[in-house]
Protein backbone atom coordinates (compact mmCIF):
# COMPACT_ATOMS: atom_id res chain seq x y z
CA UNK A 1 0.00 0.00 0.00
CA UNK A 2 1.36 3.44 -0.89
CA UNK A 3 2.26 5.91 1.80
CA UNK A 4 0.46 9.20 1.17
CA UNK A 5 1.33 12.11 3.40
CA UNK A 6 2.47 15.68 3.31
CA UNK A 7 1.27 19.22 3.81
CA UNK A 8 0.22 21.82 1.25
CA UNK A 9 -1.13 25.33 1.90
CA UNK A 10 -3.27 27.01 -0.76
CA UNK A 11 -3.72 30.80 -0.83
CA UNK A 12 -6.43 32.85 -2.48
CA UNK A 13 -4.04 35.70 -3.32
CA UNK A 14 -0.70 35.88 -5.05
CA UNK A 15 2.47 35.82 -2.95
CA UNK A 16 0.81 33.88 -0.10
CA UNK A 17 -1.88 36.45 0.75
CA UNK A 18 -5.59 36.23 1.44
CA UNK A 19 -7.58 33.30 2.73
CA UNK A 20 -5.60 30.07 3.09
CA UNK A 21 -6.39 26.37 3.29
CA UNK A 22 -4.00 23.88 4.87
CA UNK A 23 -4.34 20.32 3.60
CA UNK A 24 -2.71 17.21 5.08
CA UNK A 25 -4.32 14.46 2.95
CA UNK A 26 -6.93 13.95 0.25
CA UNK A 27 -9.22 16.97 -0.19
CA UNK A 28 -11.92 16.24 -2.75
CA UNK A 29 -13.64 19.64 -2.62
CA UNK A 30 -12.12 22.91 -1.39
CA UNK A 31 -15.53 24.58 -1.13
CA UNK A 32 -16.63 21.96 1.43
CA UNK A 33 -13.89 23.39 3.66
CA UNK A 34 -15.01 26.98 3.11
CA UNK A 35 -12.34 27.82 0.53
CA UNK A 36 -13.28 29.17 -2.88
CA UNK A 37 -11.85 27.49 -5.96
CA UNK A 38 -9.44 30.31 -6.77
CA UNK A 39 -5.83 29.51 -5.91
CA UNK A 40 -3.14 32.04 -6.76
CA UNK A 41 -0.21 30.82 -4.68
CA UNK A 42 0.81 27.56 -3.03
CA UNK A 43 3.34 26.47 -0.43
CA UNK A 44 4.19 22.75 -0.47
CA UNK A 45 5.74 22.09 2.92
CA UNK A 46 6.24 18.36 2.47
CA UNK A 47 5.52 15.58 0.04
CA UNK A 48 4.53 15.79 -3.59
CA UNK A 49 0.96 16.70 -4.55
CA UNK A 50 -1.33 16.35 -7.51
CA UNK A 51 -3.85 19.20 -7.69
CA UNK A 52 -6.90 19.25 -9.95
CA UNK A 53 -8.76 22.23 -11.39
CA UNK A 54 -12.13 20.63 -10.50
CA UNK A 55 -13.54 19.00 -7.34
CA UNK A 56 -13.53 15.21 -6.95
CA UNK A 57 -10.03 14.86 -8.40
CA UNK A 58 -11.15 15.69 -11.93
CA UNK A 59 -9.86 17.92 -14.69
CA UNK A 60 -6.41 19.20 -15.53
CA UNK A 61 -3.73 18.06 -13.11
CA UNK A 62 -0.72 19.85 -11.66
CA UNK A 63 2.11 17.97 -9.99
CA UNK A 64 3.73 20.12 -7.32
CA UNK A 65 6.83 19.21 -5.31
CA UNK A 66 8.28 20.77 -2.16
CA UNK A 67 8.65 24.53 -2.52
CA UNK A 68 6.89 27.84 -3.02
CA UNK A 69 4.67 28.76 -5.94
CA UNK A 70 3.97 32.50 -5.39
CA UNK A 71 2.11 33.21 -8.65
CA UNK A 72 -0.14 30.76 -10.48
CA UNK A 73 1.02 32.07 -13.87
CA UNK A 74 4.39 30.44 -13.20
CA UNK A 75 2.92 26.95 -12.90
CA UNK A 76 -0.47 27.29 -14.62
CA UNK A 77 -1.04 29.97 -17.20
CA UNK A 78 -4.58 28.79 -18.03
CA UNK A 79 -6.67 29.57 -14.95
CA UNK A 80 -6.53 30.17 -11.22
CA UNK A 81 -9.28 27.59 -10.62
CA UNK A 82 -8.44 24.60 -8.47
CA UNK A 83 -10.96 22.33 -6.77
CA UNK A 84 -9.20 19.35 -5.17
CA UNK A 85 -5.81 17.87 -4.32
CA UNK A 86 -4.18 14.77 -2.89
CA UNK A 87 -0.69 13.74 -1.89
CA UNK A 88 1.14 11.56 -4.37
CA UNK A 89 1.50 8.01 -3.06
CA UNK A 90 5.08 7.00 -2.47
CA UNK A 91 6.37 3.43 -2.70
CA UNK A 92 9.83 4.38 -1.54
CA UNK A 93 12.64 5.04 -3.93
CA UNK A 94 11.87 2.35 -6.49
CA UNK A 95 10.19 3.44 -9.69
CA UNK A 96 10.20 2.02 -13.16
CA UNK A 97 8.18 3.00 -16.21
CA UNK A 98 7.99 1.20 -19.54
CA UNK A 99 6.42 2.78 -22.61
CA UNK A 100 5.39 0.82 -25.69
CA UNK A 101 4.89 1.87 -29.29
CA UNK A 102 1.98 -0.52 -29.92
CA UNK A 103 -1.17 -1.54 -28.14
CA UNK A 104 -1.10 -4.45 -25.68
CA UNK A 105 2.59 -3.94 -24.85
CA UNK A 106 3.87 -4.54 -28.38
CA UNK A 107 6.39 -2.76 -30.57
CA UNK A 108 9.32 -0.65 -29.45
CA UNK A 109 9.72 -0.54 -25.65
CA UNK A 110 11.66 2.02 -23.65
CA UNK A 111 12.35 1.71 -19.91
CA UNK A 112 12.83 4.66 -17.53
CA UNK A 113 14.49 4.41 -14.13
CA UNK A 114 15.14 8.14 -13.69
CA UNK A 115 14.07 11.54 -14.99
CA UNK A 116 14.31 12.01 -18.73
CA UNK A 117 13.43 15.40 -20.25
CA UNK A 118 13.10 14.19 -23.87
CA UNK A 119 11.86 10.87 -25.20
CA UNK A 120 13.75 11.52 -28.43
CA UNK A 121 17.07 11.76 -26.56
CA UNK A 122 16.47 8.19 -25.40
CA UNK A 123 15.88 6.94 -28.96
CA UNK A 124 12.08 7.22 -29.10
CA UNK A 125 11.21 8.29 -32.66
CA UNK A 126 7.40 8.33 -32.42
CA UNK A 127 5.36 11.30 -31.16
CA UNK A 128 2.94 9.13 -29.19
CA UNK A 129 2.86 6.23 -26.73
CA UNK A 130 0.15 3.58 -26.90
CA UNK A 131 0.76 1.55 -23.74
CA UNK A 132 2.38 2.40 -20.40
CA UNK A 133 3.45 -0.03 -17.67
CA UNK A 134 4.08 1.59 -14.28
CA UNK A 135 5.98 0.12 -11.32
CA UNK A 136 5.69 2.55 -8.37
CA UNK A 137 4.74 6.21 -8.84
CA UNK A 138 5.90 8.88 -11.23
CA UNK A 139 4.94 11.88 -13.28
CA UNK A 140 5.21 12.68 -16.98
CA UNK A 141 5.05 15.96 -18.86
CA UNK A 142 4.02 16.96 -22.35
CA UNK A 143 5.12 18.76 -24.48
CA UNK A 144 8.88 18.64 -24.14
CA UNK A 145 9.48 20.88 -21.12
CA UNK A 146 9.10 19.77 -17.51
CA UNK A 147 6.01 21.30 -15.95
CA UNK A 148 4.13 22.06 -19.18
CA UNK A 149 1.13 19.75 -19.32
CA UNK A 150 1.64 17.11 -16.66
CA UNK A 151 -0.08 13.95 -15.59
CA UNK A 152 0.45 11.45 -12.86
CA UNK A 153 1.37 7.84 -13.50
CA UNK A 154 0.72 5.78 -10.44
CA UNK A 155 0.21 2.16 -9.58
CA UNK A 156 -1.03 3.19 -6.13
CA UNK A 157 -4.03 4.95 -7.66
CA UNK A 158 -4.97 1.88 -9.65
CA UNK A 159 -4.62 -0.98 -7.16
CA UNK A 160 -3.59 -1.94 -3.66
CA UNK A 161 -1.00 -4.41 -4.89
CA UNK A 162 2.51 -4.03 -3.58
CA UNK A 163 5.15 -1.83 -5.20
CA UNK A 164 6.54 -4.83 -7.03
CA UNK A 165 3.30 -5.27 -8.98
CA UNK A 166 2.96 -3.23 -12.13
CA UNK A 167 -0.17 -1.43 -13.13
CA UNK A 168 -0.76 -1.80 -16.82
CA UNK A 169 -3.18 0.40 -18.68
CA UNK A 170 -3.43 1.28 -22.36
CA UNK A 171 -2.79 5.00 -22.91
CA UNK A 172 -5.69 6.81 -24.54
CA UNK A 173 -6.38 10.48 -25.00
CA UNK A 174 -8.15 10.82 -21.63
CA UNK A 175 -7.91 7.86 -19.24
CA UNK A 176 -8.79 8.59 -15.58
CA UNK A 177 -5.36 9.76 -14.42
CA UNK A 178 -3.68 10.64 -17.72
CA UNK A 179 -4.81 13.92 -19.22
CA UNK A 180 -2.47 14.29 -22.18
CA UNK A 181 -0.60 12.17 -24.69
CA UNK A 182 3.16 11.84 -24.26
Curated annotation (Swiss-Prot):
It comes from the Eukaryota. PANTHER family: BETA/GAMMA CRYSTALLIN, GAMMA-CRYSTALLIN N. InterPro entries: Beta/Gamma-Crystallin, Beta/gamma_crystallin, G_crystallin-like. Not specifically expressed in eye. This is Gamma-crystallin N. PROSITE patterns: CRYSTALLIN_BETA_GAMMA. It comes from Homo sapiens. Keywords: Repeat. Monomer. Residues 169-182 have a biased composition (Polar residues). GO terms for biological process: lens development in camera-type eye; visual perception. Residues 6-46, 47-89, 95-136 form the Beta/gamma crystallin 'Greek key' domain. It holds the Pfam family Crystall. Residues 153-182 are annotated as: Disordered. GO terms for molecular function: structural constituent of eye lens. Belongs to the beta/gamma-crystallin family.
Amino acid sequence: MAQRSGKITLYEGKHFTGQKLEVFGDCDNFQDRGFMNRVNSIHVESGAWVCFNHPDFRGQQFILEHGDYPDFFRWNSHSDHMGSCRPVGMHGEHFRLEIFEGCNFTGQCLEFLEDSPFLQSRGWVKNCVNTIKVYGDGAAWSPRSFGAEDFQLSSSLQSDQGPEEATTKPATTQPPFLTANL
